[in-house]
UniProtKB/Swiss-Prot annotation:
Residues 40-72 form a propeptide. The modification Phenylalanine amide is found at residue 36. Expressed in corpora cardiaca (CC), corpora allata (CA), antennal lobe (AL) and gnathal ganglion (GNG) (at protein level). Expression detected in only a few animals (at protein level). This is Neuropeptide IMFamide. Keywords: Amidation, Cleavage on pair of basic residues, Neuropeptide, Secreted, Signal. It is found in: Secreted. One of its GO terms (biological process) is neuropeptide signaling pathway.
Amino acid sequence: MMRFTIGVVCLVAVLLSLAEVSEANYKNAPMNGIMFGKRGPTEYDQRGKTFTALCEIATEACQAWFPSTENK
């Protein structure tokens, strides 16, 4: 019973720490007309680069883990 209680407490602590991290990463958008669709191109550029880098990493990892067997 004691191990179960310690496990639950640890799980709750981990979940709470993850919630705090996600709150810290949240960024309020500046009020420069965003609600009217007036974003500058630089605001999209950083997200695109990040997404592209993540896709490249995932592609390389998948190719290493699951090699393709092509029949010729």
